[in-house]
From Swiss-Prot:
It is found in: Nucleus matrix; Cytoplasm, Cytoskeleton. Belongs to the actin-binding proteins ADF family. Controls reversibly actin polymerization and depolymerization in a pH-sensitive manner. It has the ability to bind G- and F-actin in a 1:1 ratio of cofilin to actin. It is the major component of intranuclear and cytoplasmic actin rods. The keyword RNA-binding does not apply. One of its GO terms (molecular function) is actin filament binding. Pfam families: Cofilin_ADF. Widely distributed in various tissues. One of its GO terms (biological process) is actin filament severing. Residues 4-153 form the ADF-H domain. GO terms for cellular component: actin cytoskeleton; cytoplasm; nuclear matrix; nucleus. Keywords: Actin-binding, Cytoplasm, Cytoskeleton, Nucleus, Phosphoprotein. The keyword Nucleotide-binding does not apply. It comes from Gallus gallus. This is Cofilin-2.
Amino acid sequence: MASGVTVNDEVIKVFNDMKVRKSSTPEEIKKRKKAVLFCLSDDKKQIIVEEAKQILVGDIGDTVEDPYTAFVKLLPLNDCRYALYDATYETKESKKEDLVFIFWAPESAPLKSKMIYASSKDAIKKKFTGIKHEWQVNGLDDIKDRSTLGEKLGGNVVVSLEGKPL
């Protein structure tokens, strides 16, 4: 069921900036987004970038010790969100980076919010071409343990996420 919600151009720009890893100067790399949240506009007609709900690569090691833990703390406990998380992980063979699309729909969110976010998910997913990993999360217990994301990324072959062993 489509909700009629549209995706703001800024959301698409953020996705494209996160997806394309072109050679960049150290300053440009620091400005790259590691994680970003998207929400519905106040009139519930557009999916927009949620201001101040992001982690930049340059924040890691400076104001952000562990990007995964910091990302989990950005999620509102009583409302839905969409998120992109640029996961850096290691398998037994190699280091990898993949974008993960997350649909955050906590049990404590209002039913109306869960319904409109669920029915609008396809609109944003269609704009995020090439996403390999999608994850619907319904509460902190599902997301706070990094090993759950490790399983989503590669089953039992992932040995570390963001430099931390699983």
